[in-house]
Amino acid sequence: MSMKYLMLLFAAMIIRSFADSGNAIETTLPEITNATTDIPAIRLCGPEGDGYCLHGDCIHARDIDGMYCRCSHGYTGIRCQHVVLVDYQRSENPNTTTSYIPSPGIVLVLVGIIIITCCSLSVYRFTRRTKLPIQDMVVP
């Protein structure tokens, strides 16, 4: 947005706030025409941008002077010169999620720890409930 448009919008908000508070002010705002509506926000560079981007498209932004690169998937950098490592690439579909499945060995170790803990707790509770010393439980 241009600065003139923002200033007119701000002035209209102030005028509306005065009108809502009971201080009626009548004014007419000038018609705003935007000459840049015919120019797309982003357009391709053309022949002068051939070879500027190594792995992507050369573009011109309407509000910023200069050539910029829109990198292809898997590349990054000012001129798309760096390869993104496969481990760090984001999916093209933002709705996909990556799930990590633990190895069976880790699952077995965790289940074993849980079983040993449960058995130890049950023996501890049994000895507290019966209040028998461990030596008395052993038959000579």
Curated annotation (Swiss-Prot):
Residues 122-140 are cytoplasmic. GO terms for cellular component: extracellular space; host cell membrane; membrane. Residues 1-18 form the signal peptide. It comes from Vaccinia virus (strain L-IVP). Residues 41-81 form the EGF-like domain. The record marks 96-97 as: Cleavage (By host protease). Belongs to the orthopoxvirus OPG019 family. Glycans are attached at residues 34, 95. The gene is OPG019. Residues 19-100 are extracellular. Induction: Expressed in the early phase of the viral replicative cycle. This is Pro-vaccinia growth factor. Keywords: Disulfide bond, Early protein, EGF-like domain, Glycoprotein, Growth factor, Host membrane, Host-virus interaction, Membrane, Secreted, Signal, Transmembrane, Transmembrane helix. The keyword Transmembrane helix applies. Stimulates cellular proliferation (hyperplasia)and mobility around infected cells to promote rapid and efficient spread of infection. This effect is beneficial for virus replication in vivo, because poxviruses replicate possibly better in proliferating cells than in quiescent cells. Acts by binding host EGFR, inducing its dimerization, autophosphorylation and leading to activation of several cellular pathways regulating cell proliferation or cell survival. Disulfide bonds join 45-58, 53-69, 71-80. Vaccinia growth factor interacts with host EGFR and promotes EGFR dimerization. InterPro entries: EGF-like_dom (IPR000742), GF_C11R (IPR011170).
